[in-house]
């Protein structure tokens, strides 16, 4: 459930910001749509006893994955978080939501993801806990409060009013159209700067609610193989929210047994085996979109709050990016083979590549000038939208985290 702020708001944003009657009209329309959303969900925006939290994300006519801001868990504050903890009996879940909101909020104010990663890494090291899902509720509360202090120490005011948060989130998403990374992406992809973006405002659903909840992305067709056979392929993870998967920040698990076998994944967990109802419902929806409605192959982002089909939610869908095949001489077969296997991972585009490892844009430029024929492979722990220039300049990408449905991969 949700509503759309159209591109007309983007085009008229200066008038809305500067002309009081236009601003009041816009606020009134947002309030009206919030009331309808409250009726549809049975929750109340800003009510600590039964809060409606929102996701606020861009929606341009041509997808620009990860280039513009997304704010999740909007409408949250300390009082509401305490209310969620009391209502659900799950303090970890409540404080994880607030932690995520604060990180999105800080990054929308130009703070670095690395700053927040350093905070949670320090907690993990000090407590001897390798994964955040193993924190207690009180420990997650301390992490969230540390995030808030980090933001305030950076000179950024944390707004507690849910409605003011929503208005700020809308402004930030609109402004992110002009961000350097979004402009760079549009130049690379040949997208006009004049189109602007709409905004999708949706009720939050929670893949981080429990170990039986999760989130993921599926392709309706194998992205590596030609043909139009409908076969689900993609990534999912449990006890996380959607941005974790598409941002490439977590290690993911395969959708099907067939995918697990083909990719030689070192996990026994697949969506098909561990969440069969979710898998079958996704398959049913894929057949409905492709076979019944004649859509092109789709990339579908989903979240499930439990193991039954009724717990599944579709967050968004878009046409799959179809990659062109290209023959590349990857290896010199006259050279002796490598003595031992150094590691293996998940291939995204199929085939193979060899080349020189690089780590920065300056390094890429230097090797392009020195050896223009040498293929360059960018190495990252994970990828974030600000890496778009490096990714575009390199020939290949190797990351320690993330899956084939992350923004960098697609």
Where are these regions (language model features)?
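Nucleotide/phosphate-binding sheet-loop regions of phosphoryl- and nucleotidyl-transfer enzymes
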Residues: 1-350, 354, 365-377, 381-389, ...
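N-terminal glycine-rich flavin-associated loop
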Residues: 357
């Amino acid at each position: 459930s949700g509503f759309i702020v159209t591109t007309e708001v983007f085009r008229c944003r200066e008038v809305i910001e500067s002309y009081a009657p236009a601003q009041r009209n816009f606020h009134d329309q947002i309030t009206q749509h919030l009331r309808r959303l409250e009726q549809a969900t049975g929750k109340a925006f800003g009510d600590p006893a039964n809060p409606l939290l929102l996701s606020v994300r861009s929606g341009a006519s041509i997808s620009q994955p990860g280039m513009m801001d997304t704010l999740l868990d909007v409408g949250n504050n300390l009082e509401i978080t305490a209310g969620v903890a009391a209502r659900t009996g799950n303090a970890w879940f409540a404080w994880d939501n607030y932690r995520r909101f604060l990180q999105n909020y800080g990054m929308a104010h130009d703070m670095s993801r690395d700053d927040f990663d350093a905070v949670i890494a320090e907690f993990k090291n000090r407590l001897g806990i390798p994964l955040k899902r193993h924190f207690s509720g009180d420990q997650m509360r301390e992490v969230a409060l540390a995030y808030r202090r980090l933001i305030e120490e950076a000179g950024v005011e944390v707004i507690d009013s849910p409605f003011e948060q929503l208005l700020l989130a809308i402004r930030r998403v609109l402004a992110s159209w002009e961000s350097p990374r979004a402009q760079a992406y549009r130049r690379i992809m040949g997208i006009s700067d004049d189109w602007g973006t709409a905004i999708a405002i949706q009720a939050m659903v929670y893949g981080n609610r429990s170990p039986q909840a999760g989130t993921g992305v599926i392709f309706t067709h194998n992205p590596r193989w030609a043909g139009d056979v409908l076969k689900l392929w993609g990534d999912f993870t449990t006890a996380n929210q959607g941005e974790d998967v598409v941002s490439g920040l977590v290690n993911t698990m395969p959708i099907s047994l067939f995918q697990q076998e083909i990719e030689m994944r070192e996990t026994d967990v697949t969506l098909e085996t561990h969440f069969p109802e979710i898998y079958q419902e996704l398959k049913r929806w894929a057949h409905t979109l492709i076979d019944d409605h004649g859509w092109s192959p789709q990339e579908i982002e989903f979240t499930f709050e439990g193991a039954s089909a009724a717990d599944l939610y579709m967050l968004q869908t878009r046409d799959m990016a179809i990659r062109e095949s290209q023959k590349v001489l990857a290896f010199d077969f006259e050279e002796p083979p490598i003595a031992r296997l150094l590691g293996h991972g998940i291939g995204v585009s199929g085939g193979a590549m060899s080349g020189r490892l690089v780590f920065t844009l300056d390094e890429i430029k230097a090797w392009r000038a020195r050896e223009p024929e040498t293929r360059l492979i960018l190495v990252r722990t994970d990828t974030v939208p600000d890496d778009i220039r490096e990714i575009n300049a390199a020939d290949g990408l190797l990351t320690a985290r993330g899956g084939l449905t992350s923004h960098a991969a697609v």
